[in-house]
């Protein structure tokens, strides 16, 4: 599955301010869906380092008109609400969202597991540490000799929290949190050892799109034709186009490692590449040959 990202925030790192009006947000939703998104993931609070927490009422003002607009135009498209607040999740679900993407793994709002269980919605449990303001910084990126093992252990805590509240296991997906509470080496370790996360037995959700780790891969990897590759440019100077194309490569590798859900800013290149990569898996290739 490909989730198209729709940030309706004024301060997100990648596209903050681009879709703060309902009209602009709905135009972007149309674009994501027309390019092949299986779902739209709507976020009303930035998680960039140093971002200020947003009151629930302000977050709701940002996301609810967009949810209503998408639901009126696209009755069947799944809508995911990216929030750590139970009040926001509850209202979004009432307006037509069917998935809660909680980047705190349900650790920041004790009411979140119960709200999701009562609604019977699907949930994405992401690994992170700390608050919304610092979960994307390096402040909490302290690990021992097995960072992937620690990520898995903490994901298991989130899974237990969800299931204890009554969320059915078939409603749970897990996100190892690429770029959250992790230095570049930690995120790369998660990607390289992703099969260990897959072994948890839940669909694995990858949200690497345009992250700092993508920029670091570009900086240290020479790619012919990529103007900012193999340079000493600061990560923030590397273009969205280069980040998007590199994201496609990372996602294809993650697919072959067992990931099944991908959250991306640009849908079409990921849709094409992931569909082609899936067609070349042994099961699908055999069917194709027939």
Where are the model-predicted features located?
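N-terminal glycine-rich anion-binding loops that anchor highly charged ligand groups
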Residues: 1-4, 31-44
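Pocket-edge structural micro-motifs
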Residues: 4-5, 208
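Short polar catalytic/cofactor-binding loops
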Residues: 7-11
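Active-site-adjacent loop and "lid" segments of alpha/beta metabolic enzymes
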Residues: 13-28, 47-72, 78, 83-87, ...
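Short acidic capping loops at alpha-helix termini that bridge into adjacent secondary structure
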Residues: 168-171
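Acidic helix/loop microenvironments that form the catalytic cleft of cell-wall polysaccharide enzymes
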Residues: 178
């Amino acid at each position: 599955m490909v989730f198209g990202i729709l940030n309706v925030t004024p301060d997100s790192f990648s596209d903050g301010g681009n879709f703060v009006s309902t009209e602009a947000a709905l135009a972007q939703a149309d674009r994501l869906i027309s390019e092949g998104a299986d779902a739209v993931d709507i976020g009303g609070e930035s998680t960039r380092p140093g971002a200020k927490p947003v009151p629930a009422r302000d977050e709701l003002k940002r996301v609810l008109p967009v949810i209503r607009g998408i639901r009126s135009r696209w009755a069947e498209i799944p809508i995911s609400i990216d929030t750590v607040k139970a009040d926001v999740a509850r209202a979004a679900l009432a307006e037509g969202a069917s998935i809660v993407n909680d980047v705190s793994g349900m650790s920041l709002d004790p009411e979140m597991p119960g709200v999701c269980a009562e609604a019977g919605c699907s949930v994405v449990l992401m690994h992170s540490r700390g608050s919304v303001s610092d979960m994307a910084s390096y402040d909490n990126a302290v690990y021992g000799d097995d960072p992937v093992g620690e990520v898995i252990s903490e994901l298991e805590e989130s899974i237990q929290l969800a299931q204890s509240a009554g969320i059915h296991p078939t409603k749970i997906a897990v996100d190892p949190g690429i770029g959250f509470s992790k230095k570049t080496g930690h995120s790369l370790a998660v990607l390289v050892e992703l099969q260990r996360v897959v072994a948890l037995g839940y669909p694995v959700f990858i949200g690497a799109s345009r992250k700092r780790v993508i920029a670091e891969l570009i900086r240290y990897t020479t790619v012919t034709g990529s103007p900012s590759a193999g340079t000493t440019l600061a990560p923030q100077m590397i273009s969205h186009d280069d980040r998007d194309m590199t994201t496609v490569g990372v996602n294809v590798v993650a697919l072959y490692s067992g990931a099944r859900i991908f959250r991306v800013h640009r849908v079409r290149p990921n849709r094409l590449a992931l569909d082609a990569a899936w067609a070349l898996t042994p099961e699908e290739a055999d069917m194709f040959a027939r």
